[in-house]
UniProtKB/Swiss-Prot annotation:
Keywords: Cytoplasm, Endoplasmic reticulum, Membrane, mRNA transport, Nucleus, Protein transport, Translocation, Transport. The gene is NPL4. Coiled coil: none annotated. GO terms for biological process: ERAD pathway; mRNA transport; protein transport; ubiquitin-dependent protein catabolic process. This is Nuclear protein localization protein 4. InterPro entries: MPN, Npl4, NPL4_C, NPL4_Zn-bd_put, Ubiquitin-like_domsf. It is a peripheral membrane protein. Involved in the import of nuclear-targeted proteins into the nucleus and the export of poly(A) RNA out of the nucleus. Has a role in the endoplasmic reticulum-associated degradation (ERAD) pathway. Its main location: cytoplasm. Residues 87-112, 613-637 are annotated as: Disordered. Residues 90-108 have a biased composition (Polar residues). One of its GO terms (cellular component) is endoplasmic reticulum membrane. Residues 263-400 form the MPN domain. Belongs to the NPL4 family. It comes from Pyricularia oryzae (strain 70-15 / ATCC MYA-4617 / FGSC 8958) (Rice blast fungus).
């Protein structure tokens, strides 16, 4: 009889006698499997994946094939694991730490030799796109998302002219509206739904509690990569692919919602100090914005990012862009921000060019006839958002989108310096992850990559599905176009609003001026002398004032003090609390700690020195009469010193005439 066996490495055919046992089947099977297969992990089943009844081959080795009910031509599904690697290609903790030895044998007694072959495209851990069972029980959201989940989000309305009921009644004309009501959003000129309003809209269509059906997570992230562990049993991509594991065609459309609705800068000085680099050097600048997320009342169930500080990582400023260097202390800066109750909320960079009019005006580069966000900036923002995913218990993967925002400082149509805020769509982030698109020289279009590499060879890891987008043609019809080779970038991002509070209450008061990091080429460097000057260490020692010594409410100064590694963790936490909450009791407690006293001693010995007074100033202070005529006193002192110098020269000349030229003078000795 002929049996067909389908496994992870393809289809096998084995001829057996019905009287043979499964031990004989295992011997024939091991001769055709890769040498790295672990015989103890071979399983057989009557259905693919977890649908069938899996049995270990070693447990049924004594049974005959006909006793199980197998007939000629039957299909058996086989699964196994490799030595030193799991079945999905990720490293095994036990096998990876111990090398293979000759004691590992096959079922027929032959030794299994080690191999150097590695999978072409190993899976990351955990596998991307993997779903989570009951994510609403295991996923931990931010406190802000939990608060918004508890709100109903209804938009209240007053009594309308069409109402015919009393003050305590309600009808269709005055009942509250849903947060995703299209008519209300159009009246308020709100272009995009908030994330939680979009969630309510999707959930109302996905789950019907009145029907008694089980709950289904309403959110799902797009996935445009080839799925691994395909249940069809063929070799993994790129050796094999089928309709179940390959991604579907992509139809791009503008994203109807945004994860963050508004960007608020706590103080105008935050942006002004960031732009000073361009004002002084003419080069562009890049920074990471640190702040926190809070509710935004102007949009139903809205979220805003409140920026409290901008950290400038190592970079090389140029007239037309920025080259980023390695940011070695990123974890340290994030730790300081975490102690202050902050987190990275976005990235900001400048794109400014002086108009040459001499009135401070700049050139308007970004407008409706050119572009707002270039293709290169879209890819860069997508990578940043991919590094900051947002956990969500409403998604089947436990995460959905990102709250990371992008701000660009450029010139507007009036020639003024203006800020523009954006976010890249979730589809754009996934297309960058899947390596489907790449930026072009034209900032208004994005290119769809080819499966061939630059040298003409076919990529063994990249799979490019069909990409389409819809547009209004010259006849006013809504048509679908092929995105290859390029498509407009407007399909890949959404716009955000921005602004400043009416009454600025920044977290960092910035009372002590301290240089911003990585500005050495401008003549600004973070040194001990700058820290001593910002903290007014010497003035404190001379005047005894405790208030002057506590000017630590500066994010850049906190990062510098963290790099000095003088304070302990508890003392540094207390320092950040003093800098953000401005509590006088905490300030006195900090002054009494050992670490702070050690820091003050270091800054006093290596920091800023008090300039010494000149001798003339000491004389004027000791002689009040001389201070009444400072000009004449200075003239008399200079004349007196000059007369003494000439007198010394004359005495030396006379001594040389009497005693000879070889004898040194008293002045020379």
């Amino acid at each position: 009889m002929l049996l067909r066996l389908r496994g992870p490495d393809g289809m096998l055919r084995i001829e057996l006698d019905p009287k043979d046992t499964f031990n004989k089947l295992g011997q024939e099977l091991m001769g055709k499997l890769p040498p790295t297969v672990d015989p103890a992990t071979i399983t057989v089943s009557n259905a693919p994946g977890s649908q069938g009844d899996k049995k270990l081959l070693k447990d049924i080795a004594k049974y005959k094939v006909e006793a199980i009910g197998l007939k000629h031509g039957d299909l058996i599904f086989v699964d196994y694991k490799h030595q030193g690697a799991e079945a999905d290609g990720t490293a095994n903790s036990d096998g990876a730490s111990q090398p293979l030895t000759s004691t590992t044998n096959r079922l027929n007694g032959q030794p299994v030799l080690p191999t150097e072959d590695l999978p072409i495209d190993p899976l990351p851990t955990p596998a991307p796109g993997a779903t989570i069972k009951n994510p609403w029980e295991v996923v931990r959201q931010s406190p802000l998302d939990d608060r918004l989940d508890k709100k109903d989000g209804k938009i209240p309305r007053k009594r309308d002219a069409m109402c015919r009921h009393g003050p305590k009644g309600m009808c269709d004309y005055c009942q509250p509206l849903d947060p995703f009501d299209a008519k209300f959003l159009a009246e308020k000129k709100i272009k995009y739904l908030s994330m939680h309003a979009h969630l309510r809209k999707i959930n109302s269509a996905t789950n019907k509690p009145e029907l008694g059906s089980s709950f289904i997570p309403p959110l799902s992230e797009p996935y445009f990569r080839v799925k691994h562990d395909c249940p069809s049993g063929h070799p993994q991509w790129p050796e094999g692919i089928c309709s179940k594991c390959q991604p579907s065609a992509i139809t791009l459309q503008p994203q109807p919602f945004r994860m963050v609705d508004h960007v608020e800068f706590a103080s105008p000085s935050i942006v002004d100090s960031f732009i000073n680099t361009w004002r002084r050097t003419g080069g562009q600048r890049y920074g990471i914005m640190y702040g926190k997320y809070s509710e935004y009342e102007e949009v139903p169930l809205g979220i805003k990012a409140v920026v409290q500080a901008i950290y400038e990582p190592p970079q090389v400023d140029e007239v037309d862009g920025v080259s980023l260097n390695s940011w070695d202390n990123e974890k340290d800066v994030n730790q300081v921000a975490r102690l202050c109750g902050l987190e990275p909320v976005g990235a900001i960079w400048t794109d400014l060019l002086d108009a040459g009019a001499g009135d401070g005006s700049v050139v308007c580069k970004r407008h409706a006839d050119s572009y707002f966000l270039s293709s290169l900036e879209v890819c860069f923002a997508a990578r940043l958002q991919a590094q900051h995913p947002k956990p969500s218990k409403w998604s089947d993967t436990g995460r959905f989108g990102s709250n990371f925002v992008t701000c660009i400082i450029s010139g507007n149509e009036q020639g003024e310096i203006a800020i523009s805020s954006y976010q890249v769509s979730n589809e754009a982030v996934e297309m960058v992850r899947a390596d489907i698109m790449e930026p072009s020289a034209d900032p208004t279009v994005m290119l769809v990559r080819e499966e061939e590499e630059d040298d003409g060879s076919t990529s063994r890891t990249r799979y490019i599905p069909d990409v389409f987008y819809r547009r209004i043609n010259e006849y006013g019809a809504n048509v679908q176009e092929n995105a290859k080779p390029s498509f407009p970038v407007e399909y890949l991002f959404v716009t955000l609003t921005h602004g400043f509070p009416d009454v600025a209450k920044p977290m960092f008061s910035d009372e002590g001026a301290f240089p911003i990091e990585n500005r050495e080429y401008m003549g600004e460097s973070q040194e001990h002398s700058a820290a001593a000057k910002a903290l007014k260490v010497h003035e404190k020692a001379s005047s005894g004032s405790s208030k002057d010594g506590m000017k630590v409410s500066n994010f850049h100064l906190l990062c510098f003090l963290h790099q000095m590694s003088v304070l302990s963790k508890d003392e540094e936490s207390l320092l950040c609390r003093v800098a953000t909450q401005h509590d006088l009791a905490d300030a006195f407690q900090l002054r009494s700690t050992t670490g702070w006293q050690t820091l003050m001693a270091i800054l006093q010995s290596t920091g800023e020195r008090i300039p010494k007074r000149s001798r003339q100033t000491d004389v004027l202070a000791a002689d009040p009469a001389a201070s009444s005529y400072p000009g004449r006193r200075g003239i008399d002192d200079s004349d007196e010193r000059l007369a003494k110098r000439f007198a010394s020269v004359r005495l030396n000349a006379r001594g040389d005439g009497r005693n000879g030229r070889d004898r040194p003078s008293a002045h020379e000795t």
